[in-house]
């Protein structure tokens, strides 16, 4: 049963234990009390150890961040992030290479989140097809360069916390 029939992009609703409740909401709709939606993001790293970072469009706050979004109704988190990367960057990901590394629940925001890691060979950034409504530009950045952006207030803070979790995971997993 849908709460709102007017939006094209629907999102599944979950209970506090992350069980689907059989209802959806539209993009931009308020999340009903006692329910949650999924949020996903991915850090893409090349063989030089740099991360593919996007400068968000001005309507999306214009800060640097990684690729993320919301799975549409019926998608798993992994399917959702693969679709987001294709839509925002024009990059086809190999599902078997997409690795989950971190996730949880934020009660105040009513979201569950899943973070993924994807290792690639060097990609020619000019070959990417950016979704201009979401992404102004992309670049490869080192860990030090990401830290500099954070210190200048230019890196999307929510994504920086996820980045720190990734660095911890990479050290443990030796990926």
Give, region by region, the residue ranges found by the protein language model:
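Acidic, metal-coordinating catalytic segment for phosphate/diphosphate chemistry
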Residues: 1-41, 47
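Residue-level detector of beta-strand face positions
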Residues: 12-13, 43, 103, 117
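Short, solvent-exposed loop/turn elements at beta->coil junctions and helix N-caps
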Residues: 27-31, 101-106
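A glycine-rich, hydrophobic loop/mini-helix early in the fold
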Residues: 39-70
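The catalytic Nudix box helix
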Residues: 53, 66-100
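Nudix hydrolase/Nudix homology domain
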Residues: 61-64, 102, 107-115, 120-175
């Amino acid at each position: 049963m849908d709460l709102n029939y007017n939006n094209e992009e629907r999102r599944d609703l979950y209970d506090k234990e992350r069980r689907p409740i059989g209802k959806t909401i539209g993009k931009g709709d308020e999340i009903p009390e006692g329910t949650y939606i999924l949020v996903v993001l991915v850090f893409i790293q090349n063989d030089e150890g740099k991360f593919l970072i996007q400068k968000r469009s001005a309507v999306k706050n214009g800060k640097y961040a990684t690729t993320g979004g919301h799975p549409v109704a019926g998608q798993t988190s992994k399917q959702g992030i693969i679709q987001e990367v294709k839509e925002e960057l024009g990059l086809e990901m190999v599902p078997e290479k997409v690795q989950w590394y971190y996730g949880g629940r934020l009660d105040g925001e009513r979201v569950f989140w899943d973070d993924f890691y994807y290792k690639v060979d060097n990609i020619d950034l000019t070959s990417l097809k950016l979704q201009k409504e979401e992404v102004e530009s992309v670049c490869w950045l080192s860990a030090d360069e990401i830290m500099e952006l954070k210190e200048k207030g230019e890196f999307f803070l929510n994504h920086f916390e996820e980045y720190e979790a990734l660095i911890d995971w990479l050290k443990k997993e030796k990926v």
